[in-house]
Amino acid sequence: MTIKLVCIGKTDKKELEALIKIYSDRLQHYIKFEFEIIPDLKKTKNLDENQQKSKEGELILSGVQNSDFVVLLDENGKQFSSESFSEYIQKRMNTGLKRLIFVIGGPYGFSEEVYKRADSKISLSKMTFSHQMVRLFFTEQLYRAFTILKNEPYHHR
């Protein structure tokens, strides 16, 4: 199985990018992990929020196949502990999926089309984080999930 994280816009801070790369590289030990960055939209001054979400949604969905399991990182999604998130990942792997895709939306969230296509929604916290930080937090939690599944000492219960 491949796990893919799809994000809108590049990471602004090189320090964050370096930390994300550390966890992305570590994940390769457990599973094929891909990080896809959809470039920020150009000329958005004349677009309202819904138009921007719609255009971003088209770009997100253009890379999604019918057989993919799509999970949105959304403030209204289900919350997990690190242990229960590892169980969630294991359940997805047990289904024989080829690709599990996690998506971090743009500044205004997701379009209705993306919500309709999504198979699941998860939330990292009730708190609000920058989309840049969510990339790091999610990648670290995904790495943590695999160390939990493998009973490795990274996670302390």
Swiss-Prot record:
Pfam families: SPOUT_MTase. It catalyses: pseudouridine(1915) in 23S rRNA + S-adenosyl-L-methionine = N(3)-methylpseudouridine(1915) in 23S rRNA + S-adenosyl-L-homocysteine + H(+). GO terms for cellular component: cytoplasm. S-adenosyl-L-methionine binds at L73, G105, L124, S125, K126, M127, T128, F129. It comes from the Bacteria. It is an enzyme of class 2 (transferase). Specifically methylates the pseudouridine at position 1915 (m3Psi1915) in 23S rRNA. It is found in: Cytoplasm. Belongs to the RNA methyltransferase RlmH family. CDD domains: RlmH-like. Keywords: Cytoplasm, Methyltransferase, rRNA processing, S-adenosyl-L-methionine, Transferase. Its EC number is 2.1.1.177. The keyword rRNA processing applies. SUPFAM superfamilies: alpha/beta knot. The keyword Cell inner membrane does not apply. The lineage of its organism: Bacteria, Pseudomonadati, Bacteroidota, Flavobacteriia, Flavobacteriales. Homodimer. The gene is rlmH. GO terms for molecular function: rRNA (pseudouridine-N3-)-methyltransferase activity. This is Ribosomal RNA large subunit methyltransferase H. InterPro entries: Alpha/beta_knot_MTases, RlmH-like, tRNA_m1G_MTases_N. Signal peptide: none annotated.
